[in-house]
Amino acid sequence: MTLILYYHPFSSYCHKAMMALYEKELEFQPFLIDLGNERSRTEFAAIWPYAKFPVLHDISAGVTLPEATIIAEYAAGLSTAGPRLIPEKPDEARSIRLYDRLLDNYLHTPLQKIVGDRLRPAGERDARGVAEARATLATTYKLLESRLTDSGWMAGDDFSLADCAAAPPLFYLSRVAPLAGHPRLMRYLKRVMERPSFRRCLDAARPFRHFFPADAADEGWPDEDMRVAF
């Protein structure tokens, strides 16, 4: 089995897929895509017309899969190593998939709105859209804070797809929309940052941190207090 992951090391959605692959102890060949390079972008668009990463290509199976959630679920079915990621019981699996949708739609999407808006020319900024994104985050933080425990993972006692979906956006959000006032969420981020699968993602991302469009009001990156110097 030969897996190729088309990705960028700084992408939070790529981290989601990478965490799943690492957790399932699946070896893969990383293929870095530079969307700022016309040739790289054109070649990638030939694989997936939307030119959005991650995309996983399983050479042995002849399968090409876009979308981080789909890749994570595929990884979960390829290996019995590590956590299941998706529970076997239908009702438990449905709960995990609901968390995955919640985290993508109400954490990841607002994150992309806030960060993406900073890349626009000054005259094209969307202040209203950013405010709406921050309001969505406030609701999501409150919801997650009410559901998290002090020792478990995002969706219960077992590490799952929900954690692969939660860790990457929370890491970046801790800078642009701080978690202060949500102690359980802060402790969760600290806990998941110690997870080897996520630490590998952060290690790969570190050389590219200058890509992040910083703002004077931003918090610093999570630091040694969380045992990761980014």
Show where each model-derived region lies.
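Short, solvent-exposed turn/loop segments enriched in Gly/Ser/Thr/Pro and often Arg
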Residues: 8, 34, 161, 205-206
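GST-like domain detector, emphasizing the conserved glutathione-binding G-site
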Residues: 1-131, 227-230
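Juxtamembrane/interface motifs at transmembrane-helix termini
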Residues: 25, 114-119, 182, 207-208, ...
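Short, flexible loop/turn segments with low-complexity composition
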Residues: 88, 200-208
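GST-like fold's C-terminal all-alpha helical module
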Residues: 99, 103-196, 203, 230
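A local structural micro-motif
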Residues: 29, 83, 156, 200-201
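Acidic/histidine-enriched, glycine/proline-rich intrinsically disordered or flexible terminal extensions
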Residues: 205-230
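A short hydrophobic/aromatic micro-motif that marks alpha-helical segments and, especially, helix-coil
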Residues: 82, 119, 178, 209-212
